[in-house]
Amino acid sequence: MAFSPWQILSPVQWAKWTWSAVRGGAAGEDEAGGPEGDPEEEDSQAETKSLSFSSDSEGNFETPEAETPIRSPFKESCDPSLGLAGPGAKSQESQEADEQLVAEVVEKCSSKTCSKPSENEVPQQAIDSHSVKNFREEPEHDFSKISIVRPFSIETKDSTDISAVLGTKAAHGCVTAVSGKALPSSPPDALQDEAMTEGSMGVTLEASAEADLKAGNSCPELVPSRRSKLRKPKPVPLRKKAIGGEFSDTNAAVEGTPLPKASYHFSPEELDENTSPLLGDARFQKSPPDLKETPGTLSSDTNDSGVELGEESRSSPLKLEFDFTEDTGNIEARKALPRKLGRKLGSTLTPKIQKDGISKSAGLEQPTDPVARDGPLSQTSSKPDPSQWESPSFNPFGSHSVLQNSPPLSSEGSYHFDPDNFDESMDPFKPTTTLTSSDFCSPTGNHVNEILESPKKAKSRLITSGCKVKKHETQSLALDACSRDEGAVISQISDISNRDGHATDEEKLASTSCGQKSAGAEVKGEPEEDLEYFECSNVPVSTINHAFSSSEAGIEKETCQKMEEDGSTVLGLLESSAEKAPVSVSCGGESPLDGICLSESDKTAVLTLIREEIITKEIEANEWKKKYEETRQEVLEMRKIVAEYEKTIAQMIEDEQRTSMTSQKSFQQLTMEKEQALADLNSVERSLSDLFRRYENLKGVLEGFKKNEEALKKCAQDYLARVKQEEQRYQALKIHAEEKLDKANEEIAQVRTKAKAESAALHAGLRKEQMKVESLERALQQKNQEIEELTKICDELIAKLGKTD
C-alpha cells in the first residue's frame, strides 16, 4: 500500500492542512462515490453544522500565528511510551515471541517506505464503493445516534481496571474511545496482554465490532465539503461475526491478505485526541512499557493494586459501551459552530479528567506485535513521566503511537474520512479492515504518520480562558519501554528535519502545559507527583496540546468523561481475548516506512531537544500560570471594586429613589393641601357673599327695630304715667283694707273665745258620760263572771248526778 506525504501527518497537522481541501472537494467526491453516500453525507453535514470548529485562538488567544513558537521537527519523532496499567507478570516465552515478531515486522516494513500519494488509488474507489454498499446493507446502524467523538468507548472501573479496548473499529470506521481510568502501569501484565492479544486480535476485534453492530453503532460518512482535494472515503462493509466461529477466518484474512489501497475516512468533527487521522477510525493505542524498566517507573499510586487489576481485567465480563447520545461537551461545541471552516477546531473537551489516569487503555491496543511493547501509547493521558525521557521511542510532541510494524490489512480495508466524526487523534490515512481482518494497523506506520508532518506545523488548541488549574497526579512513564524499537523511530527524523512551521496558540500552550508537567516530573524525580493541568469546561483541545505525553490529558478527560457518562466498562478486553486465543497473528496494514532505524546518538539528540523543549515549555507554562494568577488577582480586585461600585451606585440609586419618592409624596400632599385651601377659599367666599346678603337684610331689620324702639319708648312713657296713677290708687285701697282687716281680727277673737267656752262645757259632759259607761262595763263583767262560775257549778252538779245515776 502506498502512502502519500499527506498521509504521513499528525492528526492536527493533517486536519489543518486538509480541512479546507476536504470541505471543498466533497461535492466532487459525491459524484464519483455514487449515490450510496448521499444519506450518510447529509447526516454528516448536519453533524458538521452542529459541531464547533472555530479556532480557540479566535475567542481565547490574541497571539498571532507568526509570533507563536516554532515546533522542532524532532518533537514528534518519538511517541511517549506508557505501559498499560495492569498487574501480573509476563512469561519469558511471551517476551521471546514478542521479540521475534518485532524482527519479522521490521523486515516486512522495510520494503514499503516509499509510496505515492493516495490520490492515484483508483482500485481503492471500487473497494470503497463496494464497502459503502455493504455498509449500507446493515439496517441497524443509526448514524444519528452515534457519538461523534467516541461512539464506542470502553472503560474500567474503580481506577484499578485496565482499560483494554480494541484499538480500531476497522470494519465500519468508527472511532473507538479508550477511556479507562488512569492506572499505574504494570508492564509485566501489559506485555502479557500484547502477547496474548497477538493471537486473539481477530476475535477481540470481531467481538467489539459485533457489539457495535448490535448496538446500532456505525460511523457516519464523509460530509460533502466545499474545498476537498481528497477523495471521499466510504465505509468498509460491516460484517457480524461470532467471536469463536470467526477466529480462524480472522487470522487467515489478517495473515494472508495484502493491504489494499483504500480511501481514508476523515471526520474533522470527530477530530479528537483519542483518534489519529493517520489511523483512520482507530483510537490511539497504548503499548506497555519495557518489562525490565517498568518496575522502577511504576506509579506509586498504591490504590490501584496490581494483582486485583489483573484478576478483574480477566474475570470481569466484557462490556462494550456505545454512546448513542452526544455528551454535553459535544452538544455545546456543536451549538457554537464557527463560520471559519478553513481552520480546524480541536475536539470538544469534557472538563472531567481522571486523577490517576496513566492510560486511556489498551482497548485501542496496537496490533499486538512485540513492537507493541515498544510501540505507541495512546494519547489518552496528559501526564508525562521523566522516566520516559530516556526512551528513544518517547515522543512528547507526537500525537500518537511510536513507530511499529504493521502486518498487511485485509483486502476489504478502506480509509474512512468523515469530517463530522473526525477525531483529532484519529488517523484518516490509517486503513481500516473488516472484522475478519485484524483491526489494527501497523504501529510503525502509525508513528511514521505521526512524526512526518507537513511543512506547516499543526495547531494544537488549548483554551486557557475560563480554565481552572487543578492538581493532577501523574504516573511514572516508562521511557525506556520503547528502547527495543530503536531502529524504527528516529531514522524518520531526516524526513522531517528540514520542515518548519508556526505553531498556533493552542500548540504553544499545549507544549507549554505539557512541558511544564514533564519538566516538573524530571526535576523532582518523583515517579508520581501532582501536576497542574488546565481543566477547561467544554473547550476543544487538539491532539498536539499534550502531544509529548504518552497519554494526553485532553484525550483522557474527554474519553473518561464520555465513559463516565455512559457508565459501561470493559475490563481486560485484550487480556480476556488473548487468554481465549493466545495465537500470534499478523496485524493488518503495513507501514509505509518499514525498517527505519535510529542510532543512539540520534536518539540522545532527540531526547535532549525534547528535554530542552519540555523545560522551556514548563518555564513558559509557569510564566503563564503566574500571569494567570496575577490576572486572576487583578480580576478579583476589580470584581471587588466593581462590586463596591455597584453597591454604591445601587445605594445612590436607592437614596435617589427614596428622595424622589419623598418629594413626590410631599408634592402630592402639597397639591392636596392646595386643592383643599382652594376649596376652603371658595367656601369662604360663598360664606362671605351669604354674610353680606344677611348683613344687608339685617340693616333693613335694624332700621325697623329703631322705628319700633321709638314707638315703644312712647308707649313706655305712657305706661309710666299710668303706673303712677295706679300706685296712688293702690295706696288708698291699702289703707282701706287695713282698716277692714283690723275689724275682722277683732271679730274673730271674740268668736274664738266663745267657742273655747262651749267646747269646755261639752268636754265635761262627755267625761261624765264616759264614767258612766265604764261603770256599766265593770258591772257587766262581774255579772259575766258570776254566770260562768254558776255554769261550772251546774256542770259539776250535773256530772255528779250523772255518775250517781
Curated annotation (Swiss-Prot):
Residues 130-140, 497-509 have a biased composition (Basic and acidic residues). The keyword Protease does not apply. The modification N-acetylalanine is found at A2. GO terms for cellular component: centrosome; cytoplasm; cytosol; membrane; midbody; nucleus. Residues 152-259 are annotated as: Interaction with TDRD7. Isoform 1, isoform 3 and isoform 5 are ubiquitous. Isoform 2 is strongly expressed in the brain, weakly detectable in lung and colon, and overexpressed in gastric cancer. Isoform 4 is not detected in normal tissues, but strong expression was found in gastric cancer tissues. Down-regulated in a subset of cases of breast cancer. InterPro entries: TACC (IPR039915), TACC_C (IPR007707). It comes from the Eukaryota. This is Transforming acidic coiled-coil-containing protein 1. Residues 2-55 are annotated as: Interaction with LSM7 and SNRPG. Residues 215-297, 359-507 form the SPAZ domain. Residues 206-427 are annotated as: Interaction with YEATS4. Isoform 1 is heavily phosphorylated; isoform 6 is not. Residues 47-60, 111-128, 296-305, 377-413, 431-447 have a biased composition (Polar residues). GO terms for biological process: cell division; cerebral cortex development; microtubule cytoskeleton organization; mitotic spindle organization; nuclear migration. GO terms for molecular function: nuclear estrogen receptor binding; nuclear glucocorticoid receptor binding; nuclear receptor binding; nuclear retinoic acid receptor binding; nuclear retinoid X receptor binding; nuclear thyroid hormone receptor binding; peroxisome proliferator activated receptor binding; transcription coactivator activity. It comes from Homo sapiens. Residues 610-805 form a coiled coil. Gene3D superfamilies: 1.20.5.1700.
